[in-house]
Design a protein with these regions (language model features):
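Extended, low-hydrophobicity, polar/charged segments
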Residues: 1-170
């Protein structure tokens, strides 16, 4: 019999994230997780390791909106427009969360935060730019492991609201 711990050990995924995948019936996603000893802490590192476009990496950023944590899923090639996040949430103030708040909220360290399977239930926003690809890669709970997933499935399993919060260029 396999357990989240043995699955996590085989895949390189964090045990909490492996358990979340099993609870969602996503064992096949766990089987596709890939561990890279050189690390996938940043979107650029993950894209280089996987061999995909930077925009195919789903990065997760944690913000504090009027003191309440909110998670934003963004494609790896884009930047979050904090003013758009503020407007989307109707918040007076939105700031980047520090490492302590990230770990307290999600249960994971910066550079390995997955899109779901967090310690606490938190509001999640997903930028529409993620839908431009058939598959995106996201962290599997460690700064060395990523997994592929269809963007709409990622948004659904994260319980995210689909929004437009990326910075506009030019």
């Amino acid at each position: 019999m396999t357990t989240a711990a043995t699955d996590a050990e085989e895949s390189g995924a964090h045990p909490r994230f492996a358990e979340a995948l099993r609870a969602l019936g996503l064992d096949e996603v766990l089987a596709r997780a890939r561990r890279f000893p050189e690390g996938t802490r940043t979107a650029a590192e993950a894209a280089a390791a996987v061999g995909c476009a930077l925009s195919q990496i789903c990065k997760l950023l944690v913000f504090a909106a009027d003191g309440t944590p909110v998670l934003v899923l963004m494609d790896g090639a884009s930047r979050v427009d904090v003013d758009r996040v503020r407007a989307e949430l109707g918040a007076a103030k939105v700031t980047r969360a520090d490492a302590g708040l990230v770990r307290e909220t999600t249960g994971y360290a910066i550079g390995g935060v997955p899109p779901f399977g967090h310690r606490t239930r938190t509001r999640v926003l997903a930028d529409r730019s993620l839908l431009a690809h058939e598959v995106v890669w996201a962290a599997a709970g460690t700064p060395h492991t990523v997994f592929p997933i269809e963007p709409r499935a990622l948004v659904a399993h994260a319980g995210a609201d689909l929004v437009d919060v990326r910075e506009r260029t030019g």
